[in-house]
Amino acid sequence: MGTVHGVWLKYVALSGLSFAGYSYFSESSEDEDRSSAFSLLGLTVTRSTLPALAWGYSTAVNGVIAILFKLEWGMSILGKDTVQGTIPWWSYVVWFPFHIPTYLYTNIHKFISRYKNPETDVYEPVPVATQVQTGWWIGGCHGHELHKDWSAVIDLTVEFPESCRTVAYLAIPTWDGVPASPAQLEHAAAWAVQQHDKYGGDILVHCAHGRGRSTTVLCACLVKAGLFETWQQAFEEGIKPKRPVCKLNKRMRENLTQWQELYVAKGK
């Protein structure tokens, strides 16, 4: 969730913990006094039955999510509206074993995260968003806390609704730690430059924490805008000096390299 490496393993762990809860309450249900039990649809229900069912459901949901993360499939199953950036109420009901821990982790991570400010050499809270080049910002899902009116927002999250005020909005939902494809990078970069030229002002590229997914897309944007010749320069010289917490995993680097070969090198 908060890192760009092995995110899917966190949902494997959640599934495992949920199974432990399911096993505990299932055994408790068998040992309980049946005098307070009641029948529902032909099944005997005790005080431990509902918790056991909830933990069992959480085991299945987080197991499925972990598989989808690993396969880089199913970004649409949460029902996020890619036009408005909203997530429907039913998603929170059906996928609550995913939404609840994701929401808690992200907010706790935001609260405790610190970084060494390169300008002051002092450890400070990680900003919800950082301007790394004039008019180009990178951040997490709490960018609305800056109370800015953005010219354009690129949203890489599949797990959070969009909460920023913006003139133009582009959603490319991806699982945490999973990069946009080379084609998606080209689309996002071209779109961002077009909005920047059209409206001026500030462009925000964000994921959940402003570290991996958003960094991948912003590298492409900065190259497309003509600020840097390669994504490597955009990352090392254009982004990381201002926001040191930004990272790129192996898949992100591979996709950026493929994007550069397909859409940048051929255009020269």
Name what the model sees in each region.
Residues R213-C221:
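Hydrolases whose catalytic domains are alpha/beta-hydrolase-1, hotdog thioesterase
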Residues G210:
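Conserved G/P- and acidic residue-centered "switch" motifs that form tight phosphate/ATP-binding loops
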Residues M1-V132, H187, N255, E261-K268:
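Non-catalytic regulatory/accessory regions that flank a structured catalytic core
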Residues S91-V205, A220-G267:
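Cysteine-based protein phosphatase catalytic domain of the PTP/DSP
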